UniProtKB/Swiss-Prot annotation:
Keywords per UniProt: Carbohydrate metabolism, Glycogen biosynthesis, Glycogen metabolism, Glycosyltransferase, Transferase
PANTHER family in alphabetical order: 1,4-ALPHA-GLUCAN-BRANCHING ENZYME (PTHR43651:SF3)
Molecular functions (GO terms): 1,4-alpha-glucan branching enzyme activity; cation binding; hydrolase activity, hydrolyzing O-glycosyl compounds
Protein name: 1,4-alpha-glucan branching enzyme GlgB
InterPro entries hit by this protein: A-amylase/branching_C, Branching_enzy, GlgB, GlgB_N, GlgB_N_E_set_prok, Glyco_hydro_13_cat_dom, Glyco_hydro_13_N, Glyco_hydro_b
Enzyme Commission no: 2.4.1.18
Task of the protein: Catalyzes the formation of the alpha-1,6-glucosidic linkages in glycogen by scission of a 1,4-alpha-linked oligosaccharide from growing alpha-1,4-glucan chains and the subsequent attachment of the oligosaccharide to the alpha-1,6 position.
GO terms classed as biological process: glycogen biosynthetic process
UniProt-annotated catalytic positions: 409, 462
Gene3D superfamilies (alphabetical): Glycosidases, Golgi alpha-mannosidase II, Immunoglobulins
Pathway: Glycan biosynthesis; glycogen biosynthesis
Length: 728
């Protein structure tokens, strides 16, 4: 139709009706200022909250009063001038009057480079453009919103600022990349918002949280919170300079795994920064690994069903609080590892599921897209936008929060299409195989980007199968992880210590088999949260025997673990023999430290960490077969095993484990050199709650060949204990 000066003819009736119904997919074609270049200027506004609308020019001068078209609050009218110009709007409703800038007068938010990178699936700093960003455009303060929803008919940003009315702030669609964007003047940090989306058939979906929000309401509330890119005052330059050397294969890495909500209940991020950092420093751990911090709706998932992959959970305070926690740990010389969950996401209505009315982030076929074990959706790793979203999430935590490492959860479920599925319940890959080729490419891509963009940061795989080369470089055909959890070692050794000592002589292989494959990957030895939940009981509860034997067994186990090749990981509470199975709704039982047995266990773990860090023989060759040597793995009859840990130019450490409750006197063990040796750690020492049997004072190696070595020691082996001996 021809544009005239009559207000009712400034815009087609069908467009007016669609705007008022909230179904128009191209609001910038209708709303805002139109004309210029020889055509009359007009302004169209949808403001159902107003009775009158006027257009203001420079200095607040009223240029035109717009005419109301219909009963739903659509206003239009001509304004003087030949070319478009900045303007404001004045609204009147009864006794109330207010002014605001028109969102529909501002230019596009995304630039050409953004469109190109989004189209390529290589916008690795996606979080700098998508999400909600406080911004100033043309001198006006507000918030820029952008969200990917390519199949939506209409997307609006809603919040208290527009009475959660999806008709009032519909967004512009960037057709080429499927991103909807809008700059809303006058909004501020802290404002709540969601997206109202109409699906491909026009159906109104449940309100959605922003997939790239940097802050969320504390659950059970589900709104996103306007919050700029995390900005923190960092004081960790010293740590950042040393980080690469602190996380190499030859560095001592001893990880304390923590659930932030139950280490000590009631602590926010700042209180954790003070109390947790001091405790970890006291205990001598090199790193803290947090169970997922990403925002998650269900507390009982422990964070492993996240929705806010760019937002630290609000349960413990604002995002800045989490940054301060990381900063404090770094200042105390402690690295930070985050559990990161790219394998799957929950089906909560406000999350990623059915985001734009389609299976946008997952697969439509449940044989590919639904995980029955967890009732979650599986990401479509083959879709470049989804892979880009996840890669950007990984890089975000390293970039904006100075996180040092990501422990990638449930990698096995990503690698295999038939994971936890029977025949006929999965779809083979293009070669007819069971490997998820898209997930493999995705993991390699993430690990390469971490290596290239954040040198010194590492990734760690929780991977429970024999998939090859998980921790080998991508260029060598590997997946590119820095380390892999050794689930087989954990399963075998924990099973051994559950056995009555009388039967252990038949199961020595459970302790020795791990060395057959110990160097096939770069391993972390994990005694994680998974081993103290779901009816398994606590670590101390799983040990065989009466109370004395349980404590002795766990002390011996820890000694064996810290002497064994591989980096160390221990879940909170294990260090002082928490007796109750872990409960995410309750604090650890710190009162147990009033008991000498529990206090002794804690002291042992601290001393193990001290020895592990201090002695290169115990860590420098963790990932090199030259750093380990069996002395005697075959004395199964006595349930004794002995081995050396070595490093070039350093004193070796002899570890001897006696895993029955029998003292063995004058037990001869071959050693590589004569001279004086000394016992440097004994898990049966009285200070740890043991019976104090051992080898005080010096030990003189005799020139008696034994176990194929030129000299030997005669040792007293304490019951159910591990000892460390080294040349004096």
């Amino acid at each position: 139709m021809n544009v005239t000066s009559k207000p009712g003819e400034l815009v087609p009736e069908s467009d007016v009706a669609a705007i008022m119904r909230g179904t128009h997919g191209d609001p910038f074609r209708v709303l805002g200022m139109h004309g210029g270049g020889g055509a009359p200027l007009s302004v169209r506004v949808f403001a159902p909250q107003a009775a009158e609308v006027a257009v203001l020019g420079q200095g607040g001068k009223v240029l035109a009063s717009l005419e109301r078209i219909g009963a739903e609050g659509f206003f239009a009218g001509t304004v003087p001038g030949e070319e478009k110009f900045p303007y404001r709007l004045r609204f009147v409703s009864g006794p109330h009057e207010w002014e605001a800038d028109d969102p529909y007068r501002f230019p596009e938010v995304l630039g050409e480079l953004d469109e190109y990178l989004l189209g390529e699936g290589r916008h690795y700093q996606l979080y700098t453009r998508l999400g909600a960003h406080p911004a100033e455009i043309e001198g006006v303060q507000g918030v820029s919103f952008a969200v990917w929803a390519p199949n939506a008919r209409r997307v609006s940003v809603v919040g208290a600022f527009n009475a959660w009315d999806g008709r009032r702030h519909p967004m512009r669609k960037r057709i080429g990349v499927g991103v909807w964007e809008l700059f809303v003047p006058g909004l501020h940090t802290g404002d709540l918002y969601k997206y109202e989306i109409l699906g491909p058939s026009g159906e109104r979906l449940p309100l959605k949280s922003d997939p790239l929000s940097f802050a969320q309401e504390a659950p059970p509330a589900t709104a996103s919170v306007v919050h700029g890119l995390p900005e923190a005052e960092w004081h960790d330059a010293g740590w950042m300079q040393e980080r690469e050397s602190r996380q190499r294969r030859d560095a001592p890495i001893s990880i304390y795994e923590v659930h932030a909500g139950s280490w000590r209940q009631g602590l926010d991020y700042d209180a954790l920064a003070e109390e947790l950092s001091a405790y970890v420093r006291e205990m001598g751990f090199t790193h803290v690994e947090f169970l997922p911090i990403s925002e998650h709706p269900f507390t009982g998932s422990w964070g492993y069903q996240p929705i806010g992959l760019f937002a630290p959970t609000a349960r413990f305070g604002p995002p800045e609080g989490f940054a301060r926690l990381v900063d404090r740990l770094h200042r105390d010389g402690i690295g930070v590892i985050l559990d990161w969950v790219p394998a799957h996401f929950p089906s909560d209505a406000h999350g990623l599921a059915n985001f734009d009315g389609t299976h946008l982030y997952d697969h439509a076929d449940p044989r590919q897209g639904f995980h029955r074990d967890w009732n979650t959706q599986i990401y479509n790793f083959g879709r470049q936008e989804v892979a880009n979203f996840l890669q950007a999430s990984a890089l975000f935590w390293l970039d904006r929060y100075h996180v040092d490492a990501l422990r990638v959860d449930a990698v096995a479920s990503m690698l295999y299409l038939d994971y936890s599925r029977n025949a006929g319940e999965w779809v083979p890959n293009r070669h007819g195989g069971r490997e998820n080729l898209e997930a493999i490419d995705f993991l390699r891509g993430v690990n390469e980007r971490v290596r290239l963009d954040h040198p010194g940061c590492i990734t760690i795989a929780e991977e429970s199968t024999a998939f090859p080369q998980v921790s080998r470089p991508v260029e060598d055909g590997g997946l590119g992880f820095g380390f892999k959890w050794n689930m087989g070692w954990m399963h075998d050794t924990l099973g051994y210590f559950r056995r009555d000592p009388i039967h252990r002589k038949h199961h020595q292989n459970d302790l020795t088999f791990g060395m057959v494959y110990a160097y096939s990957e770069d391993f972390v030895l994990p005694l994680s949260h998974d081993e103290v939940v779901h009816g398994k009981g606590s670590l101390i509860g799983q040990m065989a025997g009466d109370r004395w034997q349980k404590f002795a067994n766990l002390r011996a186990y820890f000694g064996f673990m810290w002497a064994h090749p591989g980096k160390k990981l221990l879940f909170m509470g294990g260090e002082f023999a928490q007796e109750r199975e872990w409960n995410h709704d309750a604090s650890l039982d710190w009162h147990l430290l009033d008991d000498p047995s529990h206090a002794g266990m804690k002291r042992l773990v601290a001393d193990l960490n001290r020895e592990y860090r201090k002695r290169p023989a115990l860590h420098r060759m963790d990932c090199d077969p030259e750093g380990f040597e069996w002395i005697d793995a075959g004395d199964s009859e006595n349930s004794v095993l002995s081995f050396l840990r070595k490093a070039p130019g350093e004193k070796p450490v002899l570890a001897v484990c006696n895993l029955t409750p029998v003292v063995r006197s004058d037990y001869r063990i071959g050693v590589p050199e004569g001279g004086e040796w000394r016992e440097i750690l004994n898990s049966d020492a009285a200070i740890y709650g043991g019976s104090d049997v051992g080898n005080p004072g010096g030990l003189q190696a005799e020139e008696v060949s034994w176990h194929g070595r030129p000299a030997s020691l005669r040792l007293t082996l304490p019951p159910l204990a591990t000892i460390f001996v080294t040349p004096a």
